[in-house]
């Protein structure tokens, strides 16, 4: 068997390997045959503990440079048949999140921007770190410009839009409309951001969908809670939504009642709560959320929006 054929078999085996010892063995064999192969270096980096991995981002930068050299810049698309296509996306993802963790925001943003440009379907969580970097850098106009060009409408993007509008235009109908649109895209997300959701025990599975939402919440929590104005702006519609969908603990319900005082919304919320109480207790949660969001929009937005 030629070295090329052997290398191809090792790369296939690496994709299927799950045991860390097996991954390390296969990656070592790949690098014995091809000392600069990005797949081998990426696999070994992913086995590192967090501190070591952050101190070894230079290893990933070299692997990315080698990947770009081998594919002629960047893969044509997510579905480019070149075996390095997935490696390219993974390297950009790790570099963006890694440099953000090290608070090297401009470097993180550069890798995140490349990942978003490459991934127009949201396969990688690049938009999460991309918009978080822009929020950290307080580049609010750039957030709004990026959203105009982004082919995807995502919860994290719409939360970033809301925060950008809140900073550039303040509390207004446009900002509230943006927030309600963000909530409608993932109704669980604001509860995680505000720590209003009881998560499963550590040994229980979150489920793929909730895991993705949790990851987004981790990156949105700091921007949303940076000021009291931001936190309050998110909290009121979130608490109303929670009261209509059975998500609130007693103390959260009391917090809502306090926020409703002098808001002019008490009667409207009480009416909706009465309607919610009359709905089928076994109603599908997604249908309940859809009803609640429709009513929330009617309550908080002027007619015609």
Tell where the protein language model's regions lie, with residue ranges.
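Structural register within alpha-helical repeat arrays
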Residues: 10-13, 44, 88, 95, ...
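Residue-level signature for tetratricopeptide repeat
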Residues: 12-16, 30, 47, 98, ...
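Structural motif corresponding to the intra-repeat A-B loop/turn of tetratricopeptide repeats
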Residues: 17, 50-51, 102, 137, ...
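Flexible helix-coil transition and linker loops at the boundaries of alpha-helical arrays
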Residues: 30-33, 60-85, 116-118
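TPR alpha-solenoid repeat register
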Residues: 40, 91, 124-126, 157, ...
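TPR/TPR-like (Sel1-like) alpha-helical repeat modules
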Residues: 52-69, 116-120, 135, 148-155, ...
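Long, ordered, amphipathic alpha-helical scaffolds
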Residues: 164-305
